[in-house]
Amino acid sequence: MLVLKRKQGEAIHIGDDVTLTVLAIEGDQVKLGIDAPRHIDIHRHEVYIQMQEENESARNSANLMKQMIQKQSEA
């Protein structure tokens, strides 16, 4: 993991298309501004994890449904 220090108003570039700017530091929170093309998905970590869990649950449900249909057609 690359670790960088930035002050308020300073930025980091990721590749050619993404700029991450420290907009404000308020107590124990840092406000970030992200400038990226619209095709790049950006999510808070906890939201991303929740999305992954929901996608896995949906895949499991779809697989279970598929198995149930196969069993019915075999009977």
Swiss-Prot record:
Main location: cytoplasm
Compartment(s) where it occurs, according to its Swiss-Prot or TrEMBL record: Cytoplasm
Record-level GO cellular component terms: cytosol
InterPro entries: CsrA, CsrA_sf
GO molecular function: mRNA 5'-UTR binding
GO biological processes: bacterial-type flagellum organization; mRNA catabolic process; negative regulation of translational initiation; regulation of bacterial-type flagellum assembly; regulation of carbohydrate metabolic process
Entry keyword set: Bacterial flagellum biogenesis, Cytoplasm, Repressor, RNA-binding, Translation regulation
Signal peptide interval: none
Similarity comment: Belongs to the CsrA/RsmA family.
Role, per record: A translational regulator that binds mRNA to regulate translation initiation and/or mRNA stability. Usually binds in the 5'-UTR at or near the Shine-Dalgarno sequence preventing ribosome-binding, thus repressing translation. Its main target seems to be the major flagellin gene, while its function is anatagonized by FliW.
Subunit structure: Homodimer; the beta-strands of each monomer intercalate to form a hydrophobic core, while the alpha-helices form wings that extend away from the core.
Entry-linked PANTHER family: CARBON STORAGE REGULATOR
Name assigned to this protein: Translational regulator CsrA
Organism per entry: Exiguobacterium sp. (strain ATCC BAA-1283 / AT1b)
Encoding gene, per UniProt annotation: csrA
